[in-house]
Regions:
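C-terminal extensions
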Residues: 1-56, 60-206
Length: 206
């Protein structure tokens, strides 16, 4: 199992469904315009996985060539390339996690383990609270603070989130945040559902 998604294993159909459920930034909602038709055009070019799509958009020349071949506007493909970049979560510094033992963080730093990825990959028998937090930040959009709220709400792993129901998860996470004030953002069921769907991708494709 890998820390991040194996983009080679995610089909364009899977990614299309993820986009439909995601709470996209305002500047990226253009991706939902003619989504099904445009993804069908991409498939017609022999692109079947997210890795292949990312490679086809990896340079301005390749992007322009794909736009010419499909008739999809370059602006659309440029924004799609940016959104694809968000599939790979950047590791979180262990020191960013709230309410963790400073002594443990210092001890790990002495072993050159400073990020969520490094601690998660060490794995083994050390599947403690910190490991759970490192697992949770593998989910797209979940940072150190949200991971703490998820953990205290009873979701201690990617698998637990993948098996959650959005309404119930929102209720439990919101209750934790109301008590602890971990974050200021107002989250809704759609945000929880996106986390659940992304967690399912991690379970299936990491």
């Amino acid at each position: 199992m890998r820390y991040t998604l194996s983009l080679e294993r995610i089909t364009l159909s899977d990614y299309q469904q993820l986009l439909l459920k995601q709470n996209l930034l305002p500047g990226r909602r253009i991706l939902l315009e003619q989504l099904e038709a445009r993804f069908a055009m991409l498939c017609d070019q022999g692109l079947t996985t997210v890795a292949q799509l990312a490679a086809a958009l990896s340079s301005p020349n390749k992007l322009s060539s794909l736009a010419a071949a499909t008739g999809i506007p370059e602006e659309y493909l440029t924004i799609l390339r940016r959104e694809l970049g968000s599939l790979s979560q950047k590791p979180v510094p262990l020191s960013d996690f709230p309410a963790c033992s400073p002594a443990q963080i210092r001890s790990l730093a002495e072993e050159s383990i400073r990020t969520s990825k490094e601690y998660w990959e060490r794995g083994g028998a050390t599947q403690d609270e910190l490991f759970s937090l490192c697992d949770l930040v593998r989910i797209n959009g979940v940072g150190a603070v949200a991971a703490r709220a998820f953990y205290e709400a009873g979701y201690s792993s990617v698998a637990a989130v993948a098996n959650a129901a959005a309404a119930g998860m929102l209720k439990r996470v919101s209750a934790v945040n109301a008590e602890k004030s971990y974050y200021k953002a107002k989250l809704g069921e759609k945000d929880m559902q996106f986390c659940i769907d992304y967690a399912k991708l991690l379970v299936a494709y990491s």
